[in-house]
UniProtKB/Swiss-Prot annotation:
It is an enzyme of class 2 (transferase). InterPro entries: DNA-dir_RNA_pol_insert (IPR011262), DNA-dir_RNA_pol_RpoA/D/Rpb3 (IPR011263), DNA-dir_RpoA (IPR011773), RBP11-like (IPR036603), RNAP_asu_C (IPR011260), RNApol_insert_sf (IPR036643). Residues 1-233 are annotated as: Alpha N-terminal domain (alpha-NTD). This is DNA-directed RNA polymerase subunit alpha. It is found in: Plastid, Chloroplast. Pfam families: RNA_pol_A_bac (PF01000), RNA_pol_A_CTD (PF03118), RNA_pol_L (PF01193). In plastids the minimal PEP RNA polymerase catalytic core is composed of four subunits: alpha, beta, beta', and beta''. When a (nuclear-encoded) sigma factor is associated with the core the holoenzyme is formed, which can initiate transcription. Keywords: Chloroplast, DNA-directed RNA polymerase, Nucleotidyltransferase, Plastid, Transcription, Transferase. GO terms for cellular component: chloroplast; DNA-directed RNA polymerase complex; mitochondrion. Its main location: plastid. The lineage of its organism: Eukaryota, Viridiplantae, Streptophyta, Embryophyta, Tracheophyta.
Length: 337
C-alpha cells in the first residue's frame, strides 16, 4: 500500500494520488485529490466524475457460451460436478482486460478429471485474464469439456432476454463496468471569501483497470461529451430583434463573429457583452462605470464621449477601434451627431 501526505497548493489547480493499494488480483483501490477549488466546484466535479466512472468506462466480459451437448441452461452433464447454470455464473465472474473493439471468440477444451480454471481459456492475443485462478468447473470423470465463448467489450449492463437463446448457445448477463465503486468527499478550508475546497475521489476497480487508468478514462469521456458545445453550428448563434438576447461565449466571440460578418448575417448588438472581447480589464472597468455593458451601448457613444470617462486614454480608444474593425468591420464616430 502506498500513502502520501496530503499537501494543498494555494496556486495552480492540481491532482495527486494520495493512496494506492492492491487488495487482491480483482480489487484495486486508489484515492485522489484535486485542489484548490472554489466553493461549489468540488461537488460539481465529484458528481460528474462518479457518474462517468460508474457508467461511461468500457469493460470486457464473456457474453455467450456455445455447446451443442447442453440441452438447456439448468441441465447437468455427467462427469461435471457443477450444473450448466453454475458454470455460466462462474464464467460471468471472469475478469478480462483488453483493447478489443466489438466482439471476439474464445474457447475452452480440457480433458478430465481435473479442475477447469480461467487459465484454460484460449483467448485472442489482444485479450488477457486478470486472475488465472478463477474457478469454472470440476471434471470428475475422464470426459472432454469443450465449449466456445463470445467475448464483448461494451459499457454498462447486458441483460439476457428470451430471444437471445439459440440452439446450443447461452447468453450470460454481463456487467461491463470495471469500476466496482466510486465515492467523493469534500474538505473545505479558509475563511470568509477566501474559502476553498479539496475534492477527494475514491475508486475501487476489478483489476482490469487501475484506479488511475479509470480516472483518466472517465475524464476523457467527460471531455468528449462537452466537445460538441465548442463546435456549435453558426445557425444556432443568429438572433432576431424580437428574441431574448443571450451573451455569446468567449470562443464564439473570437471564432465565429468574423464569419458571421462575411456572411452578412445580422447580429443583435445588444446581446454581445464587452467583457467577452479582448479589452483589458482596466478599459472594461472604465466602461462599466459609465454604464456601457454591450456592444450596442458602446456604439451609442462617440470617441469624444469615451474620452470624457475618468482615467480613459487615447490608447484605450485605439484598442477599442482595433477590435471593432477586426471583428465587426465597423467604426466608432469621433463626435456626437
Amino acid at each position: 500500500m502506498v500513502r502520501e501526505k496530503v499537501t494543498v497548493s494555494t496556486r495552480t489547480l492540481q491532482w495527486k494520488c494520495v493512496e494506492s493499494r492492491t487488495d487482491s488480483k480483482r480489487l484495486y483501490y486508489g484515492r485522489f485529490i484535486l485542489s484548490p477549488l472554489m466553493k461549489g466546484q468540488a461537488d460539481t466535479i465529484g458528481i460528474a466524475m462518479r457518474r462517468a466512472l460508474l457508467g461511461e468506462i468500457e469493460g470486457t466480459c464473456i457474453t455467450r457460451v456455445k455447446s451443442e451437448k447442453v440441452p438447456h441452461e439448468y441441465s447437468t452433464i455427467t462427469g461435471i460436478q457443477e450444473s450448466v447454470h453454475e458454470i455460466l455464473m462462474n464464467l460471468k465472474e471472469i475478469v478480462l482486460r483488453s483493447n478489443l473493439y466489438g466482439t471476439s471468440d474464445a474457447s475452452i477444451c480440457v480433458k478430465g478429471p481435473g479442475y477447469v480454471t480461467a487459465q484454460d481459456i484460449i483467448l485472442p492475443p489482444y485479450v488477457e485474464i486478470v486472475d488465472n485462478t478463477q474457478h469454472i468447473a470440476s471434471l470428475t470423470e475422464p470426459i472432454d469439456f469443450c465449449i466456445g465463448l463470445q467475448i464483448e467489450r461494451n459499457r454498462g449492463y447486458l441483460i439476457k432476454t428470451p430471444h437471445n437463446f439459440q440452439d446450443g448457445s447461452y447468453p450470460i448477463d454481463a456487467v461491463f463496468m470495471p469500476v466496482r465503486n466510486a465515492n467523493h468527499s469534500i474538505h473545505s478550508y479558509g475563511n470568509g471569501n477566501e474559502k476553498q475546497e479539496i475534492l477527494f475521489i475514491e475508486i475501487w476497480t476489478n483489476g482490469s483497470l487501475t484506479p488511475k487508468e479509470a480516472l483518466h478514462d472517465a475524464s476523457r469521456n467527460l471531455i468528449d461529451l462537452f466537445i460538441p458545445f465548442l463546435h456549435m453550428e453558426e445557425d444556432n448563434l443568429y438572433l432576431q430583434d424580437n428574441q431574448h438576447t443571450v451573451p455569446l461565449s468567449p470562443f464564439t466571440f473570437h471564432d465565429k463573429l468574423a464569419k458571421l460578418i462575411k456572411n452578412k448575417k445580422k447580429i443583435a448588438l445588444k446581446s454581445i457583452f464587452i467583457d467577452q472581447s479582448e479589452l483589458s480589464s482596466r478599459i472594461y472597468n472604465c466602461l462599466k462605470m459609465s454604464n456601457i455593458y454591450t456592444l450596442l451601448d458602446l456604439l451609442n457613444n462617440s470617441q469624444e464621449d469615451l474620452m470624457k470617462i475618468e482615467h480613459f486614454r487615447s490608447e484605450d480608444i485605439k484598442q477599442i477601434l482595433g477590435i471593432l474593425e477586426k471583428y465587426f468591420v465597423i467604426d466608432l464616430a469621433k463626435n456626437k451627431f
